[in-house]
């Protein structure tokens, strides 16, 4: 696919192309400039040269798909949960980074997505909309081009994308629901750790208890985050005395050979189709509870 073609919607009535790209698609200045320089925007199948022309309901707008530079491929077959022309949802395995932090890292989830895109003959990029810790398994959302990443990133920044995690923790709970509203900051004494700190960034986690196992003194909980701080769920659960099983960095028991945290559900609005979308992926065979 080389173009995105869609009708002018009612709430776009009278807007110029610049306004639509900026206010509806949330495209930055650089991406808008790339589209302008392509000279490949069509209105009703004819070139649109004047970007100050008001657009009206019933017209058809066609925009060129602008891509980022491709990243190296990693020959790993991911579980694809959903895919269309603009986005892709995968079930990331535990132990795999979401994307590279350095140029030499090519065995990440993003590199595996790029491998899938090229293997299936797609002119697209693997652009992670959010990230999961290397030690966390579950759903990760990828955009395929600059048009898609702009709208999805805007949703992330405005908390319109909701993620739900499954965690197996030490100890049993008396409460069914609990909200943890405690700021998280760096641990000055341990570079890879975070801690609850009055000087940290705001962080809110909602916890729902699904099951108590009194015999083994463990619980299964569901967590929804309003913010996306590093190690947020791990720090918050540890901070109230229920560290995640396998998370020895934050005081969890070593009864599992992985951290028992899985991104189970994902909710978003499609950036172009305008519909709500819900995805889920069960935890893998290495899940212990």
Model-derived segments and spans:
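Conserved, well-folded catalytic cores of nucleic-acid-processing
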Residues: 24, 116, 159, 187-190, ...
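Short polybasic amphipathic segments
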Residues: 39-43, 184, 266-268
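Pseudouridine synthases involved in rRNA/tRNA modification
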Residues: 1-34, 201-204, 209-220, 226-289
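A short, acidic/glycine-rich surface segment
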Residues: 73-74, 150-152, 190-194, 245, ...
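Glycine- and acidic-residue-rich catalytic/RNA-contacting loop of pseudouridine synthases
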Residues: 95-115, 149-154, 166-220, 235, ...
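RNA pseudouridine synthases
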Residues: 1-179, 260, 288
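A structural signal for short hydrophobic beta-strand segments in well-ordered beta-sheet cores
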Residues: 80-81, 129, 184, 207-210, ...
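Residue-level signature for short turns and capping positions that connect secondary-structure elements
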Residues: 48, 68, 94-95, 103, ...
């Amino acid at each position: 696919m080389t173009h995105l073609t869609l009708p002018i919607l009612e709430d776009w009535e009278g807007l110029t192309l610049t306004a639509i790209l900026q206010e509806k698609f949330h495209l930055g200045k650089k991406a808008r400039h790339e589209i302008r320089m392509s000279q490949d925007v069509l209105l009703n199948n004819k070139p649109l040269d004047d970007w100050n022309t008001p657009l009206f309901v019933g017209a058809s707008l066609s925009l060129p798909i602008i891509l980022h530079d491709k990243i190296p491929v990693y020959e790993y077959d991911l579980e694809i949960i959903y895919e269309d022309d603009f986005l892709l949802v995968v079930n990331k395995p535990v132990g795999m980074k979401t994307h590279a932090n350095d140029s030499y890292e090519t065995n990440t989830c993003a590199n595996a997505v790029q491998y899938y895109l090229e293997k299936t003959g797609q002119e697209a990029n693997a652009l992670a909309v959010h990230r999961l810790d290397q030690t966390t398994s579950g759903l990760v959302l990828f955009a395929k081009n600059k048009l898609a990443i702009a709208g999805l990133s805007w949703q992330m920044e405005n908390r319109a994308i909701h993620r739900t995690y499954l965690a197996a923790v030490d100890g049993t709970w008396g409460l069914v629901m609990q909200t943890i509203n405690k700021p998280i900051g760096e641990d000055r004494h341990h570079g890879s750790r975070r801690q609850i700190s009055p000087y940290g960034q705001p962080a809110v986690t909602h916890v729902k208890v699904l099951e108590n196992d009194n015999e083994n003194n463990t619980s299964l909980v569901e967590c929804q985050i309003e913010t996306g701080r590093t190690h947020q769920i791990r720090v918050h659960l540890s901070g109230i005395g229920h560290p995640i099983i396998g998370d020895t960095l934050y005081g969890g028991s070593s009864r599992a050979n992985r951290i028992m945290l899985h991104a189970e559900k994902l909710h978003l609005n499609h950036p172009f189709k305008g519909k709500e979308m819900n995805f889920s992926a069960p935890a893998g065979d290495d899940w212990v509870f």
